[in-house]
């Protein structure tokens, strides 16, 4: 993938990546941000929209003191694209990547089970906000609605997203915007937002939408692979 200019994010503690679940390129983008952030002074915390109780198991695995028992994870049954063969391969990559780092990258899972959308997003935000007083850089990837900075209405109901609760001055929100392709969420689906060609490259630009600070245009999306 094309190298990106990360200079706009140097002073930001919280970097939110708003994804469409079930796209393989999400993981490649996340890896690019990790590779950039680990060159800086602060330790990096990678935050995943996975059940928070998996945090300890995953970090033990990254440190080489535990196994990754993903086949027992209940949430893989949702088949909503948040976890896949590519995500497990990503954790294997992160474990190997960590071997060469003085300050190890850790993972924080932040999904919680609650009654409603707004309550869930507030609780997920609180998990990230616990890191505010720590000298760390947080890279969090989540569904793009959760990464929004502003309240919004959907089906005539007000939604207050995770991104709304984070400190504006130290947070940047980036929407991953795919031009065309396929994704897997319950089933494989195809879409075309805009025409593209083989020469189209990644493009990071300031967002015209007040919900996000930046938009990262991605030429083509490919679906993730189901865990078996």
Model-predicted regions and their roles:
Residues 1-228:
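Compositional signal for N-terminal targeting/processing segments
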């Amino acid at each position: 993938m094309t190298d990106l200019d990360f200079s706009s994010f140097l002073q930001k503690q919280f970097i939110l990546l708003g994804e469409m679940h079930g796209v393989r390129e999400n993981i490649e983008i996340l890896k690019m941000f990790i590779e950039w952030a680990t060159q800086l002074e602060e330790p990096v915390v990678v935050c995943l929209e996975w059940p928070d109780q998996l945090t300890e198991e995953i970090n033990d695995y990254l440190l080489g003191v535990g196994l990754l028992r993903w086949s027992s994870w209940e949430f893989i049954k949702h088949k909503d694209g948040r976890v896949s063969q590519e995500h497990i391969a990503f954790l294997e990559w992160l474990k190997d990547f960590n071997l060469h780092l003085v300050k190890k990258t850790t993972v924080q899972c932040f999904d919680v089970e609650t009654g409603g959308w707004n309550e869930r997003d507030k609780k997920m935000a609180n998990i990230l906000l616990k890191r505010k007083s720590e000298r760390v850089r947080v890279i969090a990837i989540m569904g793009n609605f959760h990464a929004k900075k502003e309240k919004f209405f959907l089906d005539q109901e007000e939604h207050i997203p995770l991104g709304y609760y984070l400190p504006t001055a130290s947070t940047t929100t980036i929407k991953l915007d795919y031009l065309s392709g396929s994704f897997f969420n319950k089933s494989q689906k195809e879409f075309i937002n805009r025409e593209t060609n083989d020469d189209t490259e990644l493009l990071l630009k300031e967002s015209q939408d007040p919900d996000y600070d930046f938009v990262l245009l991605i030429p083509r999306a490919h679906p993730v692979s189901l865990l078996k």
